[in-house]
Amino acid sequence: MIKKESFFTEYRVSAVPDEEYAKVSSYIDHFMRAFANTTYKSIYLIDYYKKTFLYVSDNPLFLCGLSPKDVKELGFDFYLNYVPYVEQKMLIEINHAGFQFIRTVEPEERYKYTISYSFHICPPHKEPLLINHKVTPVLLTTKGDIWLALCTAQLSSESASGHIEMTCQTNNKLWRLESGLWKEYPGVELTENERSMLRLTVGGLSIEKIADRLLRSAETIKSYRRFVFKKLEVGNITEAIMMAINKKLI
């Protein structure tokens, strides 16, 4: 049987004294509320030392019909209540693999890394939602352990759960978790014309109008689309836009 403690069997956080909590408590709530007001994503803050959620935004996507207070009080039990059992096991494997990866990174560099993956949440009496979930360290202990981490959730552009990636904000590399092992891949790069095509598409322009704006033919714009679909491993322009935004390519 999976329990909340299953998420922490391979990771122990060094002690965080009360005075450290006193330092951050005065501004964390204000900062998180301000951040929540600027994004369409659901956000929450994990405390790995106390094994709880410190903050949960009021975006309804992630709440499964609960209040932010309810989700905050549930903490990691939220996953056990609202994620399919087979994917609960996947989340635990991701948790363990993520911590194993981060141990290989120098403490001062750990803030730069983000793990991303997709899983289902099951709101009562509704169809399951496939969400993309990202976790980024926010504060470390004096010994370099991850103390607080920012989590974001949004609708996933994938077709199934999984697709586990680790990225670093200072380089174009990415690592994918495959059969329990991290495998390095080159990151996705778009040309300036491909990025412009996506931005103008987001702005509502048709292929013909994008062609006029970029001084290219409509067939050339269509070729940009095909290249983007291949690079991002998607099947249509909506998925391409979501993936490009998700990967911070536009």
Q: Residue spans of the language-model regions?
A:
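Short, low-complexity N-terminal regulatory "tails/caps" that precede and couple sensory modules
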Residues: M1-A22
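PAS-family sensory domain signal
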Residues: Y21-F76, T170-E178
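Regulatory hinge/linker segments at domain boundaries
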Residues: T170-R195
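Intrinsically disordered, low-complexity basic tails/linkers immediately adjacent to helix-turn-helix/homeobox/MYB/SANT
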Residues: M243-I250
